[in-house]
Regions:
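C-terminal helical cap/extension that packs against the catalytic core
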Residues: 264-270, 274, 379, 387, ...
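Acidic, Mg2+-coordinating active-site environments of NTP-dependent enzymes
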Residues: 3-4, 11, 16, 21-31, ...
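N-terminal leader/targeting and accessory segments in enzymes
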Residues: 1-105, 109-110, 115-121
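Nucleotide phosphate-binding/pyrophosphate-handling subdomain across enzymes
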Residues: 201-204, 214-225, 229-230, 295-441
Length: 593
């Protein structure tokens, strides 16, 4: 289908959804509207978030970084100037006893595991999730946590305006950049909060890359970590794993221990070279199985086989931090077999303590391999948005379905995919990876919670228009339909020589499809999509409204009947953490409190 025809379909869709005279101001993960003029600062939380949003959105910050790629080092110097204007010096950050973590996949989970382990030792923890890594699920204050809890709206508001006024008072009219962008402001604010709260340690997640990330003004972390590497943000970090590894290794510091998980040979060699250049002791984490040997198996609070590597890295980071701070009870060393094939020395193999075990078990990370059961509906939520993370998501979904109680062949079950992908990522490879899950329905919608006006500043987005997001959903549907056509001719189950980790190796056991076949639908917002999927069977969701908000599709009514009669409905929500956050907000309204 041509792009022009897609635009015409989007226009018809808008006409169907919004009657004449209705203003299409849309609520979403962030609201779609023209950027408002900054208002006089108030003292309410929503006022603070609106003003924060006016500084710049992530997308415009990334565009600025791309324009200035030849002058990257200047960005760190600029960040140091902002820090000084805020009333702090780089040396002040030393007292935060920082654990600095980068990586492409799993760095957020690694940080969550690490923070939970150390909190179990009675330590007061700070945790900062950089805006460059992933979007916040519901509220921006989730990014700054004390003892695992987001700072309260009152504390966020107080710290925001204090920092904002300091920066306003120190503006230089001759400078081309008078206020820090969204990324930088939140990073500065986190440092101020952690210092004022007198945390024992701060776990700081890198936003994008490492070498030139705004968090890399940290000069003396206690320990650094690098989670699994992959291809992402190529316009900023480079288009090869080696180039990306060079950027990630930029957080290494002289004499500061660093740990990484197994990586491909090329990127691992780059990390080793980066470490050697600045005399940073870099260690390779042994697998979790080595720490479990002779011990009860470790239970992880985050599901998915891929979380074991993140947990192994977190254990090493936590133990190293405790050791360097002269804490007792850090786990007895165990004998280990040295590997002659490693490019790096192996990190210690030790016996995890009860604090470590309970920390791993009790870790929670909403929106990542998360399962919610609501009567006959089970929601599988994972914000995977790269090929490698979607592969891991499919493995997790497959394992979860295999673990569920088996129902007889006469009991109908339905599988639904709810998907969206944003930015400049190509959705086709992601959708192809999801195909083997054998979904009965593929549902596409923008990252908009509902179609209505809102005053919720946490969900504002100034970077895209309604036409753009709906057109992208239609393109997702077209990709899915083409995959349907391809699957109709060759035998999907007899692909010779499946590539390790590729789609064929992720196939679920074949099952007979429902009589209605596979169908795809497009909705105008998350709320309408959830209403159609749940068909009134989830008491916390509204009864389905008229299907006029649907892009016209002949299976809308028959699909609703199938969903109402199914004994079990399994819904995988993936492709965008914004989408997952919007779904969670509707399924669990307490997250907005």
């Amino acid at each position: 289908m041509s792009r022009a025809r897609s635009h015409r379909r989007a226009g018809l869709f808008l006409a169907a959804v919004f009657p004449r005279g209705v203003t299409t101001r849309v609520t979403g993960r962030r609201e779609l509207s023209a950027r408002p003029a900054p208002q006089e600062p108030g003292m309410e939380y929503q006022d603070a978030v609106r003003t924060l949003n006016s500084l710049q959105t992530n997308a415009s910050y990334l565009a600025e970084v791309k324009r200035r790629r030849g002058d990257l080092q200047t960005q760190l110097e600029t960040m140091k100037l902002y820090l000084a204007r805020s009333g702090l010096q780089v040396e002040d950050l030393d007292q935060l006893n920082i654990i600095h973590v980068t990586g492409t996949k799993g760095k957020g989970s690694t940080c969550a595991f690490t923070e939970r382990i150390l909190r179990n030792y009675g330590l007061k923890t700070g945790f900062f999730r950089s805006p460059g890594s992933s979007p916040h699920l519901v509220q921006v204050r989730e990014r700054i946590r004390i003892n695992g809890q987001p700072i309260s709206p009152e504390h966020f508001t107080k710290h925001f305006w204090r920092l904002y006024h300091r920066l306003e008072e120190t503006k230089d009219s001759s400078s081309c950049v008078s206020m820090p962008a969204y990324f930088r402001f939140l990073t500065l604010m986190a440092f101020h909060v952690f210092l004022q709260e007198k945390v024992d340690l701060a776990v700081v997640e890198v936003g994008i890359g490492g070498a030139y990330d705004c968090t890399n003004i940290i000069r003396k972390p206690v320990v650094c970590g690098v989670s699994s590497l992959g291809i992402d943000h190529t316009s900023l970090l480079g288009d090869t794993m080696e180039k990306i590894a060079w950027q990630k290794g930029g957080i290494f510091k002289h004499g500061v221990p660093a740990f990484t998980v197994p990586q491909p040979d090329g990127p691992l060699a780059v990390l080793r070279e980066r470490a050697e250049q600045i005399s940073c002791p870099l260690y390779l984490c042994p697998p979790l199985e080595a720490l479990e040997e002779g011990e009860p198996p470790l239970t992880l609070g985050l599901e998915g086989e891929h979380q074991r590597a993140n947990a192994a890295l977190a254990l090493q980071l936590a133990r190293c931090w405790l050791q360097r701070k002269d804490h007792q009870g850090i786990g007895e060393l165990k004998a280990s077999r040295p590997s002659l094939l490693c490019q790096l020395p192996l990190a210690p193999v030790f016996q995890p303590t009860s604090h470590m075990r309970h920390g791993l078990r009790d870790t929670e990370w909403p929106g990542r391999t998360q399962t919610l059961r609501r009567g006959p509906l089970t929601w599988y939520l994972d914000g995977a948005h790269t090929s490698s993370s979607v592969q891991a998501c499919v493995r997790w979904f497959r394992q979860a379905l295999h673990r569920r109680p088996k129902s007889g062949p006469e009991v109908p079950e339905v599988r639904v995919l709810l998907f969206n992908s944003t930015g400049d990522r190509d959705p086709a490879p992601l959708l192809k990876l999801l195909r083997p899950c054998q979904f009965d329905y593929a549902v596409f919608c923008p990252n908009l919670t509902e179609v209505s006006s809102t005053d919720n500043a946490d969900q504002q987005n100034f970077m895209v228009t309604l036409d753009q997001v709906l057109l992208r959903c239609l393109e997702h549907q077209q990709h899915w339909s083409r995959l349907d056509e391809e699957a109709a001719s060759p035998d999907l189950w007899s692909t010779p020589g499946p590539e390790a980790g590729g789609p064929a190796s992720l196939l679920l056991a074949p099952r007979l499809p429902h009589a209605h076949g596979t169908s795809s639908l497009v909705f105008s917002c998350i709320s309408h999509a959830l209403q159609w999927i749940s068909q009134g069977r989830d008491p916390d969701l509204q009864t389905p409204s008229s299907p006029r908000d649907l892009l016209a599709h002949p299976v809308a009514s028959s699909g609703a009947s199938v969903l109402r009669e199914a004994a079990a409905v399994h819904v995988l929500v993936t492709g965008s953490l914004h989408l997952v956050g919007g779904v969670l907000k509707l399924l669990d309204p307490s997250l907005s409190q």
